[in-house]
Regions:
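Hydrophobic faces of well-ordered beta-strands that scaffold small-molecule active sites
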Residues: 25-29, 65-67, 106-110, 159-163, ...
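Sec-dependent N-terminal signal peptides
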Residues: 4-14
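Boundary/entry segment of secreted carbohydrate-active catalytic domains
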Residues: 21-56
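Glycoside hydrolase catalytic-domain groove-lining segments
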Residues: 51-54, 196, 211-218, 225, ...
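Residue-level detector of functionally pivotal "anchor" positions at catalytic/ligand-binding pockets or at interdomain
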Residues: 387-410
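Aromatic-rich peripheral "rim/lid" segments of glycoside hydrolase catalytic domains that contact
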Residues: 42, 180-181, 273, 277-284, ...
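Substrate-binding cleft and catalytic face of glycoside hydrolase catalytic domains
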Residues: 56-194, 199-225
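C-terminal tail/sorting-segment detector
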Residues: 421-433
Length: 433
């Protein structure tokens, strides 16, 4: 009997850390101050004006926000400034403090570039291009340290720190405009020297994070999650190679950060396959979806059309959100979900004089035509609830769940009352519509 009790206690000790992991949900709101200052009009689902969007997000159950940081966005190309590149340190300190003062956690997203950093472009900041590799590593450390010191002094200490944005292929490849053959990418076929240079830069970034913000968790962010849309990622080859390289280089980090946009990354099943591999290969790491999105109106051009399952509509976006959350909640190591550019809202702006970007973004959580919050916004908080919305819960939904939500018979919560005929669960009862 004693051995059985001891075994049970050991088993509980093994699972309790996973079960007790705190979850975080919110979005990247890096342009929110610009929208507010320029006069964007925000409304809730019922059409009531939102005086303070950040407070509204908190009321909707969100508990964390993400903000990007560029080294010197004044040196970004004009086209990219028109896409929303403006987040210098002063801007980020102010927004970061607002987030912290609202009682939310802050994820700071270092881009280590003057403009967008992603798999297609990771250009060295203009003021750093003349440095050799050793000097560049030192600059990365000192810049990271100095930024974090200023953030702390301003009352905007980050809780999560991304040391690079979508750095699947490395970062700081070289000067913008340099010949392609002179850029130091980290592809599957790249020379080992490129990977060594990259991990040395990353080591200095993470070192500064530990020195200045020892309580913050470090995020390594990639986006190789598709086996159908990303040709170097068959059987998740690029994803596997990346984190194996990080292990070999002994990179210090806590969280695996991923991006997922169906129009670029394919089906949700592909994302889940990536998560399954990562949680098995790196059980000591947390996993966060640090960028996600899907359209509620007007499609975004990409390589994959998911409208056969999720139409471009408020309900389609809501159903996508419900299914994404249900999938993520099947994986205990997944502890974060952030919707990218959730604040985009053209309603109320004078397009000629007060526009924030030069084009609409159609996967935000506000309708650009009306300024109303989409249904998906209020669904995000479901990620924080323990348990999952699947078939196993139908009995609970039918017999005990006396709330105003609508569910399908397989346990999926709908963003609003169903518009198609069928059998649903509502207020604990089966209902025919």
């Amino acid at each position: 009997m004693m051995r059985k009790i001891l075994f049970t206690m050991l088993a509980l000790a093994a699972v309790l850390p996973a079960l007790s992991q705190e979850r975080f949900v919110g979005g990247d709101i890096s342009l929110l101050p610009s929208y507010v200052e320029n006069g964007a009009e925000y409304y809730d689902h019922q059409g009531q004006p939102i005086a303070d969007p950040l407070a509204f997000f908190q009321q909707q159950g969100m508990n964390a926000m993400r903000v990007r940081l560029f080294v010197d966005p004044s040196q970004a190309p004009e086209q990219e400034k028109g896409e929303g590149v403006r987040q210098d340190l002063e801007y980020v300190k102010r927004l970061g403090k607002q987030i912290k003062d609202a009682g939310m956690k802050l994820m700071l997203d270092f881009h280590y570039s003057d403009s967008w950093a992603d798999p297609g472009k990771q250009f060295t900041p203009q003021d750093w291009v003349a440095l050799d590799d050793g000097q560049l590593a030192e600059r990365v450390h000192d810049y990271t340290r100095d930024v974090l010191r200023e953030m702390k002094a301003y009352g905007a200490e980050p809780d999560f720190i991304q040391t690079g944005n979508e750095i699947s292929y490395g970062m700081m490849w070289g000067e913008r405009g340099a010949a392609e053959e002179n850029l130091l990418h980290c592809w599957l076929s790249s020379p080992e020297a490129n990977w060594t240079r990259f991990t040395r830069l990353l080591t200095q970034a993470t070192k500064a994070c530990r020195e200045e913000c020892p309580q913050a968790k470090i995020v390594l962010h990639v986006e190789r999650v598709s086996t159908s849309q990303q040709k170097d990622n068959q059987d998740y080859a690029a994803l596997k190679n990346y984190y194996e390289k990080m292990t070999t280089a002994q990179i210090d980090y806590d969280i695996i950060g991923l991006s997922y946009y169906p129009y670029f990354h394919g089906t949700m099943e592909e994302l889940e396959g990536a998560i399954q591999y990562l949680e098995q290969a790196y059980p000591e790491k947390e996993i966060m979806l640090v960028e996600a999105g899907y359209c509620a109106h007007d499609a975004i051009n990409g390589t994959f059309d998911y409208t056969y399952k999720y139409p471009i509509s408020d309900q389609g976006q809501g159903n996508f959100t419900c299914d994404l959350i249900a999938m993520l909640k099947r994986h205990e190591r997944v502890t974060g979900l952030f919707w990218w550019f959730m604040e985009a809202n053209e309603h109320g702006l004078d397009w000629n004089t007060e526009r924030v970007t030069d084009a609409w973004y159609n996967a935000s959580l506000f309708d650009n035509h009306t300024g109303h919050a989409t249904s998906a916004l209020s669904l995000l908080k479901d990620f924080l609830e323990r348990g999952s919305t699947d078939m196993a819960q139908v009995e609970t939904l039918q017999g005990q769940n006396k709330n105003n939500h609508w569910y399908t018979l397989d346990g999926k919560r709908l963003p609003s009352a169903p518009t198609t005929k069928g059998l649903y669960i509502h207020n604990g009862n089966k209902v025919v519509r």
